[in-house]
């Protein structure tokens, strides 16, 4: 259930309530693909750095340790000892991005595992069943993820099939939630808008899926080849047709600047591997811009990663020390940097929410949208 508390322009300040708590929005979901954050962060760490929602991956957990094992362990919350909300993606993106050997049919997709090459089938019903076994609070519809740009005729064909798959997802989600032994009978299904960079196809698809009256809607298929401006144009085209009383989720996006600009265009939920992935390569975010900690100029730098940051890392360690850890290939380097970057993203969302509460979001946007994209 989503409650809109305040708005400034199209930017929205709200609350989303599910079986495992209430989420303050706009929010960034911390990505734990296989039930853990890459970089050795635990569920306890996530609490300490302000994470509200954890995101895990259906495809990867289906392969290892298998969703049936997770179900036997009591569901993903119990398995990873995380008591907050969890969103699971449908596995569609990974099926289409990781497997070069795949065959798309009306019933679903036949593909080869990227781990051992074994043949696997996944369709709308299978995706819903896997996510039901995981017991997430939010499950995402199974969809086809296409590259940008793609031929218009193929995009239209793909979107029509994705719509039919969503109808099947909705029916299967309702069936599974009604079972007496289901892990999370309050699991919510969110639909995904597709259509590549064709605004008219996007708008038509959004209108059709809005009629299905789902608890939330995502804009998918972006940040996969188009420019930032093309992405913003798509959001602006689709947003007027997204139900105002439902959550809006921009999948796989993005940089701090992308997030600020998408909030300004009416988006509530975000996820991206960027903060953790960049951290693992010593590329860090700060309130003055992006830092590459491997640069020689930090070798004798006694200051924290970001003097304006109060994360556990910045309160204790110097740039020089963390740089040394990277050069020495110590695992602690990744842990500290992932912790800092995720804290930064969670703090960014907190500051956006505070700005919306105080009616100062546009001023915040003017101050930080361009600044956070700089390299220093």
Q: Where is each model-derived feature located?
A:
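Non-catalytic, usually N-terminal nucleic-acid engagement modules in DNA/RNA processing proteins
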Residues: 1-183, 296-299
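Structural signal for hydrophobic packing residues in well-ordered secondary-structure cores
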Residues: 135, 166, 170-173, 177, ...
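C-terminal extensions of enzymes
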Residues: 1-15, 23-32, 39-40, 143-149, ...
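Glycine- and acidic
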Residues: 148-151, 156, 216-222, 331-334
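Alpha-helical packing segments of well-folded alpha/beta enzyme cores
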Residues: 127, 158, 162-165, 169, ...
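Conserved, mostly hydrophobic/aromatic
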Residues: 21, 54, 89, 131, ...
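Glycine-rich phosphate/ribose-binding loops and adjacent secondary-structure elements
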Residues: 160-163, 172, 176, 188-305
């Amino acid at each position: 259930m989503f409650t809109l508390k305040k708005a400034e322009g199209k930017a929205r300040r709200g609350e989303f309530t599910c079986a495992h708590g209430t989420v303050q929005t706009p929010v960034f979901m911390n990505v734990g693909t296989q039930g853990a954050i890459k970089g050795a962060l635990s569920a306890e760490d996530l609490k300490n750095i302000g994470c509200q929602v954890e995101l895990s991956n259906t495809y990867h957990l289906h392969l290892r340790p298998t969703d049936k094992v997770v179900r036997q362990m009591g569901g993903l919350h119990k398995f990873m000892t995380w008591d907050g909300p969890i969103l699971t993606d449908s596995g569609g993106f990974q099926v289409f991005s990781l497997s070069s050997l795949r065959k798309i049919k009306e019933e679903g997709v036949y593909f080869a595992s990227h781990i051992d090459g074994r043949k696997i089938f996944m369709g709308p019903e299978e995706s819903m069943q896997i996510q039901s076994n995981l017991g997430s609070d939010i499950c995402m519809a199974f969809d086809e993820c296409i590259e940008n740009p793609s031929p218009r005729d193929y995009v239209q064909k793909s979107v029509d099939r994705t719509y039919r798959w969503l109808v099947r997802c909705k029916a299967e989600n309702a069936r599974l939630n009604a079972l007496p032994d289901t892990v999370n009978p309050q699991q919510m299904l969110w639909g995904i808008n597709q259509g590549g960079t064709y605004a008219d196809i996007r708008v038509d698809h959004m209108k059709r899926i809005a009629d299905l009256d789902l608890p939330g809607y995502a804009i998918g298929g972006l940040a996969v080849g188009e420019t930032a401006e093309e992405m913003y144009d798509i959001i602006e085209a689709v947003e007027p047709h997204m139900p105002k009383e439902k959550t809006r989720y921009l999948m796989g996006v993005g940089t701090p600047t992308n997030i600020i600009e998408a909030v300004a265009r009416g988006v509530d939920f975000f996820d991206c591997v960027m903060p953790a992935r960049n951290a693992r390569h010593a590329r860090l975010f700060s309130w003055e811009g992006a830092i590459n900690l491997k640069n020689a100029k930090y070798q004798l730098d006694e200051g924290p990663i970001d003097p304006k940051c109060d994360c556990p890392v910045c309160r204790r360690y110097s740039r020089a020390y963390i740089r040394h850890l990277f050069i020495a290939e110590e695992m602690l380097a990744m842990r500290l940097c992932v912790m800092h970057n995720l804290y930064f993203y969670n703090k960014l969302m907190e500051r956006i929410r505070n700005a919306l509460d105080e009616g100062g979001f546009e001023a915040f946007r003017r101050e930080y949208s361009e600044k956070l994209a700089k390299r220093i």
